[in-house]
Amino acid sequence: MASLLDGVNAATLRSDVPAFRPGDTVNVHVRVIEGNRSRIQQFKGVVIRRQGSGVSETFTVRKVSFSVGVERTFPVHSPIFEKIELVTRGDVRRAKLYFLRELRGKAAKIKEKRDN
């Protein structure tokens, strides 16, 4: 039974997901269905958490839109998004960046990781 589940899980995993971590800025191209039409909408923000493993792995992206914080959680291996673009790498020391919810303006800015 476990090998059957492993086979199904392996078949549903996506291979086009880039390696990203909390603190990174990503641009998620989400497929939005409105009535009988579908279009691609971009959701650009900072990854504040990544949790789970396998098929049930999720990540949460936070952005500020018109001075209102918006967070959206996506399954990593979901067909709902076209692609994930890695914009910048962030230099953080935490796995969960929930403290960004209380910060405003420049205080909520994350340092960019330098490539050495």
Curated annotation (Swiss-Prot):
Xref: InterPro entries: Ribosomal_bL19, Ribosomal_bL19_CS, Ribosomal_bL19_sf, Translation_prot_SH3-like_sf
Cited function: This protein is located at the 30S-50S ribosomal subunit interface and may play a role in the structure and function of the aminoacyl-tRNA binding site.
Q: Which GO terms describe its molecular function?
A: structural constituent of ribosome
Under which name does UniProt file this protein? Large ribosomal subunit protein bL19
Lineage, opening ranks: Bacteria, Bacillati, Actinomycetota, Actinomycetes, Kitasatosporales
Q: Which domain of life is it from?
A: Bacteria
Q: Name one GO cellular component term.
A: cytosolic large ribosomal subunit
Please state which protein family the record places this protein in.
Answer: Belongs to the bacterial ribosomal protein bL19 family.
Q: What processes does the entry annotate via GO biological process terms?
A: translation
Offer one Pfam family short name for this entry: Ribosomal_L19
Q: Which UniProt keywords apply?
A: Ribonucleoprotein, Ribosomal protein
